[in-house]
Amino acid sequence: VFRPVPLSAIDAQEMIDGLATQQLLGEFRGEAAVNRTALAQVLLGLSALAAARPDVASVDVNPLIVRADGEPVAVDALVEIGDPDVRSGSHRPRPTDAQFRALFEPKGVLVTGASTHPGKFGFVSLHNILASGYEGAVFGTNLQGEEVLGIRTVAEIEALPEGAIDLVFVCTPASANPAMLRACAAKGVKAAFLTSAGYGEAGEEGRRAEADLVALADELGILLAGPNGQGVVSTPVNLCAQIVAPFPPSGRIGVASQSGNFVSSFLNYSRQTGVGISRAVSAGNAAAVTPADYLDWFAEDAATAVSLAYVEGIVDGRGLLERFASVAARKPLVVVKGGATEGGARAAASHTGALAADDKVFDGACRQAGVTRAVTVEEAFEAAATFATQPLPKGPNTIVLTTAGGWGVVTSDAIVRDGRLRLMELPADLQAQIDTKLPPRWSRNNPVDCAGGEVRDTIPEVMEMIAAHPEVHAIVYLGIGIQSNQARLMQEGRFYPGNGLERIVAYHERQDERFAEAAHELSQRYGKPTLTATELAVADPDNAGPRAVRATGRLCYASGNRAVTALGHLWQYAQFRERRGL
């Protein structure tokens, strides 16, 4: 278990709680349990030593024994003294709110290098801006002054109106960019997004050119996004200034990524699931504006409820985690990190020139900062989508409501394995209530297995009984879409629409719609997360069940296991906020 210093008392207790060897800390053969408060004081003492003495390279306390009364005692310690760590990260000021507004909500956009060739960045980006429904003014430069997609371009920026453009989207070569920035500044441009490559990722000469361009942008008062970036998305103003698709539905997830491909991945998941995006940006080389800068602004952005980030490496680890902690104290922050393995670290370095740090230390620092760390892009998006659409749980007590026994068993296993949630015992009064709605063969336990005894209103009524119970903190609902799956086969068969099938198909589909609506409405009414899961979310997304879940704006999870992982992230973050009085 790792945490960076300085530790707080809460950090120390969480480190102890995170040990895999919890049973060793309990009572054993008449000896007292370990005094966790005293053990936390040992950790706090080591933290104070490390903070006060930067020349301490390592401390090996061996052994740390526990007396019969439970008190820990350090018998011996080896302290290694080395050179003080004098490394310090860069501390560029974050761009202003006005500059970020120019990037994400510009009154006008200029595409430099607009092209009539549909394979060129200058065509694709202009097309995407126009096709996404952006209503601001759109301009383009083209050496021949050609008309591109109905936009009359100009050969020189000097020919454009002053004060009409906030954002320049740069599709011209690196060599042309210094003069271009000067001309844009003269027209009142406040933000520039550079797709141009050939900078810091391309060797020493490129790094010098990048540093010179950053200095020039600072001098001109222009926010410099990129270079070597993919683009920027802002759904509140229907802006899709990108060199690739897609444009996502509107929502409350803000995305910042060092990799443009990960931006595309998150936007694709948004389109698939219907859980929308507020802002998205690929930081590229992050020469002047880092992912942490974007995340810090997202934490202030009224359109954004949760931030989602991909990072490939850590240069200023302490500085980055301090920024992460500041963000997570205000809004949920989900991070997926490349370079977690030795092979991945090498790949990350070759991609954006990023340097990888020790992954275990990074993981511990994320936990300390309240950052939700995901292992995969799927887990990351689903965590962010859950934060964006579900209330935080007030406790770990979880009930599984299922229409099929096997799904409930597997999901119960997932809750136990996750370790953060509690598969609660079904309270006697709740069991008695449910008895009035289900046949005698139902499970009478958690998971609540309806045992095929549902009639028209059973699922919504049982779900409300569970949601209303004061000891229940969260619900995972399994089995939506089963009736609509049968309806699909009826429609595809040769007997439809006769034989009463048209009526029963409509009934089946309406039932699944009612179940999705009930899960959403009850979650809002009682302030408890209610996660709906079925493999039909991916196996048959047009099924009325998952389709109805999407219509509520919430995520329909592809399995109970994935719902449990997302719910565990919610409870972990809720605990982080509660313990720190946030």
Located regions from the model:
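Catalytic-core regions of core metabolic enzymes
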Residues: V1-L582
